[in-house]
Amino acid sequence: MFVRKKTNRSGTISVVVVSKAHGKFTEVKKFGVAKSEEEGDELFRKAQLWLRTHDGQQELDFDDRKGKEVEETERFLGNIDSVLINGTQLLLNQVYDSIGFNQIPDEILRHLVIARVSQPKSKLATVEYLKSYYDEDVDLNHIYRYMDKLYNTQMELAQQISVEHTRKLSGGKIGLMFYDVTTLYFETADTDVLREPGFSKDGKTAESQVVLGMLVSEGGYPLSYSLFNGSQYEGFTMIPMIDDFKQRFNLGKDFVVVADSGLMNKNNVTLLQEAGYKYILGARIKSENANVKQWILSLEKVDKACYNYERENGERLIVSYSEKRAKKDAYNRDRGIARLRKACKSGRITKNQVNKRGYNKFLEISKDIEVVISEEKIAEDCKWDGLKGYITNTDLDAERVIAEYHGLWVVERAFRVSKGTLEMRPMFHFTERRIEAHVCICFIAYKIYKELERLIDINKIGMSVDKVLDAAKTITTIRVRLPENGTYATKTLFLTEKHLAVKPLFDLSDN
């Protein structure tokens, strides 16, 4: 060690004792900053005096501390029992328990659901994932046996837990209840009682499928679901499911059913009325009787205007007009007609295509027995641009009815996340029990996805669910053996900015 006297840019003089090791200088002790040469000399003398009394001892203490530090670090590292990249598991376990799914006693369900949210894979790949990342040994055959058990004894409890949690968040009531259907296809053309070809919403015409109906709450939480035969007409799925849901969960009539016009027919509306349900439905205004259609087309087309048509049965037809929708209707029709004209010109249009599907509705057969595009039909269709109808028997004003109907996007998003992010389809199970169990696992996984989304919002994390999960995937927990105590100490490490950003989600006791 030696004393360094350094003149600073400001003209002051710094006096420090420094040491040199391995070509690097380290400050050992500072003695101050002098404003004059006299003060600098005085500090320099004090530093030399200190150095004469501490030089040997300092080197000895410093070397001793370094040796102890190395020894303690090596001992600590030698006692590390495990290092797990388990941030996702820790986070999703808390969400799983906070909803109440820990009431289902089988831990294998927890493993399957959390794996479905964090790393959706086949059941075989899930086994490997659980072992690699969480050190969980789960046998594949055990998974299949459990899926049979889930179908036989636990599916009802899972839906009950989900409904009660949603009720709790909604102040004890369900309120709005959105219904829609989608299709789930299989990587096979084989059929049975449940799996059959049908109209596919995924464009899979060759594969067998099932129809999935789902009820979703106003906040987007999944309430209940049912599977139907793959060839089932979607309009026949809604009433049985709502009746069953109401009976199973003792709902009373404190809810309003919201559904798209594609699910509606006169029979469904009649059944809703007879059951005493409140509803908001998409209307097929072009299918109304002549008097109603004449009234609709006589309405003044003012942007965002709403008009009520009272029916005798206490039902209202609400018609709204939107300039934005009118432009979209015209744009889509022009594109469709352009494709039709191109197909007609090339001779690809046949008589079999003269139907009411899509823009084929503008086709007709001429007197010369040729397929032509009807300009009269196009002109008639233009009259309806920008008009949209809604049917309701509620007391809500027209603007509120329209706003609630537009909440149907929550069901569409539920299907999009379940089928895409959570990879509910394609399905590779071929027995009814395991198909139902697979959908139940995905249903619970989506419930956890939605609850995590709510917690992210409450804690003002400012990230999407997917980005939070990505950050959690690199959070590590170490476990260290304490030989003297005969116990273990664990520590979850939040090392990066992203880790620190999501850290509030790892303590959900206040949410």
Where are the regions that the model predicts?
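Conserved glycine(s) in the ABC-transporter nucleotide-binding domain "signature"
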Residues: 1-107
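Anion-binding and metal-coordination hotspots
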Residues: 3, 11-15, 24, 94-511
